[in-house]
Amino acid sequence: KPGPWVSTKVDSICSYCSMGCNLSYKIFYDHCFTVDNVNGDSHNKGYLCSKGRFGYRYMIDEKRLLKPMIKKRGQHVEATWDDAIKTVVDKVSSIVEKNGPDSVAIFASPRMTNEELYALQKFARVGIKTNNVGSFSNILNNIEYDCLDDMFGLTVSTTTMDELNNADVILVINADLSEENLIAELKIKAAQKSGAKIVTVNSSEIPLNKFSDLWVDPKRGTNTVLIQGISKYISDMGFEDNNFIGERTENYEVFKKSLP
């Protein structure tokens, strides 16, 4: 029988993905003992995905580096934080003095929080005076993010999760939400119970297909052709919302001419 473990509750934000779900850590001594959901007025409504609930184990992984390592004579040697910071300052200062600030680039880890990313870009732009700031996330996930910046001006969604509740039809294209964003999948299923129709476009048998009202299984690599065909049909039938298009988009006529 487990003992009555005394733990400290710490409410926090999950940093695994951009959802930023509210959660609660139960701390036992210096180790994370368990993770619970936070009920109440939070955007995730108490839902947590498996990564948010169980992914905390990486924080106490025995293989995790707890102290800085400096490479000397081809070997990584344990160092103090003061020595590590001084080494970074000396190396970066030497490079900037010799080649200028634009010779330095800062790359962020995909695991960093928004607050850490903000501090890192401040360090780059104010401290080093370079705008060469990037991330390894698109390299690791093989995702191209620039297209969102080009189309929407920001690498963010143009809607909110709560607006799914007001949707009549929800189209999920080439995404496995059970792996990529389980909270979004749970909210889509909840919207379906309120009357929304789910259409999935995916050439793989993802879990959401079992719940969708229509599963379109295109030939791999033809999603763009499918979307162009849908757009062409909407345009030919006059189903587009011209007021919305006029207020929020540019070069729509050019887009229409590009359709097959």
Residue ranges of predicted features:
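Catalytic alpha/large subunits of respiratory electron-transfer oxidoreductases
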Residues: 2-260
